[in-house]
């Protein structure tokens, strides 16, 4: 391996996935290990205490296995990248402590990674996407539009005023007794349903801006369920289809507004990147693709398996930061909240 090629170990423990990966600056994945904690399914959502203990139990062995699979040693690693926030603080502490231990023992640089930045940058591992671009993050914890000017340089255009979109998928699935996580099963059920069965509220779509509000949609679904004495599979499919159709309409409306806002700020912007767990939904992808095309925008998604949390995106974000010499001191602390727009705000917009 040429010396100019950078190799980064990435560690992700912000929620209920324990993940480790080794990637390089040639955009190659040398190893990737991920363990999705099934313990949360019976609770219909992530239990922070259970997640933290699972990371403690699994992360060390997963890291060793990842290094062995890559056929490298720690001496071949140029830096350690670790999610430092935002996320569940217990899990973040576990990942950060392991990463700091590796960095301390090896003398390698450590890079604290903003989890949302990792979602934002992972598409650049697969496509040639130059800055600036418009970003939509739709995940279990976040729902927001940002302009990405560079690594570490973001400008927020809008966000959810209440629930994140992924959270609403999970809560609707829980109401319908479909299990956790809710996104994949609602998408599957919607294929057999009638999307015109129920009229659901499309909050804020009559207004300018690109903020979201999903609390009314969640309440409307709950009311429909409560008004039916018997919940059969047909009703579940119809509710799922109507819900997903409503979400698609909201996304299209908000994307139209966000594109107009981004172009007014910077005329160079002609690309939309959509990432986060909800971005794996095929039907919503099709809706957003048509919307972007109607606005003469190119749209990009990460591979579906990398829309949800993973170690590859942390490793790649580490590469993006390392090539700019953005490394961290060992005394940083994990952060439950860490807005993207607060990163290196003094970087010049190139």
Swiss-Prot record:
Entry binding sites for Fe cation: 115, 119, 309
Cofactor(s) annotated in UniProt: Fe(2+)
Main location: cytoplasm
Binding site for substrate: 137-141, 170, 183, 281
Class of the enzyme per the UniProt entry, highest EC level: transferase
GO molecular function: iron ion binding; N(6)-L-threonylcarbamoyladenine synthase activity
Alphabetized InterPro entries for the sequence: ATPase_NBD, Gcp-like_dom, KAE1/TsaD, TsaD
One example of a Gene Ontology biological process annotation: tRNA threonylcarbamoyladenosine modification
Localization terms from the record: Cytoplasm
GO terms under cellular component: cytoplasm
Role, per record: Required for the formation of a threonylcarbamoyl group on adenosine at position 37 (t(6)A37) in tRNAs that read codons beginning with adenine. Is involved in the transfer of the threonylcarbamoyl moiety of threonylcarbamoyl-AMP (TC-AMP) to the N6 group of A37, together with TsaE and TsaB. TsaD likely plays a direct catalytic role in this reaction.
UniProt xrefs under HAMAP family: TsaD
Protein name per UniProt: tRNA N6-adenosine threonylcarbamoyltransferase
Organism listed in the record: Ehrlichia canis (strain Jake)
